[in-house]
Amino acid sequence: MASGLRAAGRATAFVFDLMPMLPSAPLERLSPAPVRERVVLPSDSGEGLGDVFRPARGGGRPGVALSLGVVPAGLEHPQIPRLGRALARAGFVALVYWSPAMQDRRLDPDDVDDLAAAFEHLRGLPGVDPARCGLFGTCVGGAFALLAAAHPSIRDRVAFVGTFAPYASVETFVQAIASRTRRSVAGHTPWTVDPLTWAVYVRTMTDVLPPDERDRLRAGFETPTSSASSAAGLGAESLAVRRLLEPVPLEQTDEAVAGLPDEVRRRFSLMSPLDHLDGIRAPLVVVGHDRDDLVIPVEESRRLRARLLGRPGFRYTEFGLFEHADPTKRRLAPHRLGLELGKFVRYAYPLFRV
């Protein structure tokens, strides 16, 4: 367990290295460049890919398996190697798990098994302390990090799990998308569904349908405002899915979800962290979300908070700094930027105590 002062220093250095608006050149001059290597990971579908970022020297390092969700810009989005290098320079061995399904803009419950296998691969890497390994995920990858942390094969060996901008329940997320409504205890507000959210939604909802009907629905509902394709000739299961691709009044979403095919609803549960939180054994669970996130509404993380509040080791933070985990898209006044960055250091700090 790292001392509090040392952990605070590492967390601060990590934030300076991660955030593009902050000067990181001094850190780069004072420490050798991290090492990056591509690895092949075990997968239910055969072989998966991962990227390992490690400090240039030293052993006995904590490890973190990263699930970064759907990245439209692909594997070389500039923030991804920046994150890996920042973690490595701060002392972690970081393994980025690349999900073939998420690269195809789909959610697949098999990713939970594959992420758990990636975690075990991380624990066996040279220079890694297997007792100080955890998981971290962003966006839908954050939800899968929570699901993997509850996986029976690894849950007793996960030292921490952290997330940023996850969803809590596929069902509530589907209801929000279908109704174009953000729902919270304070009331309901209209929501303009982000194009990325919509693309993943349509591809995930149609994934188990017959290929010809799947392709028809994907083509007919390419954007949230697409003109609906004809329902003629669709089977009962495809019609049930199609109903939720059209705008549905919020009060009708429960009925519409209940009418989905059994296999679709089974997959919903397998991919919903709220259904698996009791399986998490990690002593540290960290959740963060931007209040104005347009891709996954903050209400999803608030549902996690409601279930986890009071649990020892649980930390929750809301930010006004990011645009869906991306710190480059907002311009804040200097004093507000300073406050938000300080908040982010405090959010990250517990992870550096491991």
Protein language model features and the residues they cover:
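Conserved alpha/beta-hydrolase "nucleophile elbow" surrounding the catalytic nucleophile
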Residues: C133-G142, D290
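Catalytic nucleophile-loop/oxyanion-hole region of alpha/beta-hydrolase
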Residues: L75-L83, V96-G134, F144, A149-P152
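N-terminal cap/lid segment of alpha/beta-hydrolase-fold proteins
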Residues: G9-G59
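C-terminal catalytic histidine-bearing segment of alpha/beta-hydrolase fold enzymes
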Residues: Q175, G233-S269, R302-A306, G310-V354
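Short beta-strand/loop motif that positions the catalytic acidic residue
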Residues: I280, V286-H289, D293
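Conserved serine/cysteine hydrolase catalytic core
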Residues: S269-L284
